[in-house]
């Protein structure tokens, strides 16, 4: 390489070439390996970008916002999934064991994984619910593809046919969408083997409107007669 560079009139000594290759390799080890481990061990990986996470050491306020938003969104989503399965949603979502799988340099990467349930938390017959929850968590990036410029597109019904799970997913994405106030302008969300989604203040506006005024397909009017057995005023 040094000889080829000399023919082109470039001053490239073997030592300078080795130094450059070593620097590139060290940068790859510093940034690539931690991220690769995150992608392999996490159910969901967040990548935040913005002025608050540009430095080598991200702002603590930005990190705290991301970790709190992730926990709140996933616990709320888990409560909806448990509720759909007729389980004690309040108890199980509160006891949900969410693990921080690690962080990686390059703006701010943060990985989250759902730990297996313990025997005292859930019986064996209900363990499939956790797999449904893990699937719902990993599908969050896929759902972002249905967020259009001004509205959530009808394709969301193909991704999430169940209306209740669809609403829960949109609420989770709304909670994850950056406000821009903590130095985070965009948040990429990815999961193993699935497409990466992106959330920003624009998606936040669209999601807020979709959650506030859901687009109900096949609307019908009718009168219902029955007895109200239970009402959850917290939802």
Regions found by a protein language model. Name each.
Residues 201-221:
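Short boundary/loop segments of OB/S1/cold-shock single-stranded nucleic-acid-binding domains
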Residues 1-201:
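Protein-protein interaction interfaces in oligomeric scaffolds
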Residues 32-34, 195, 212-216, 226:
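Short, flexible coil/linker segments at or flanking structured domains
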Residues 218-233:
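Structural detector for short beta-strands of small beta-barrel domains
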Residues 181-183, 231-234:
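A short, compositionally biased
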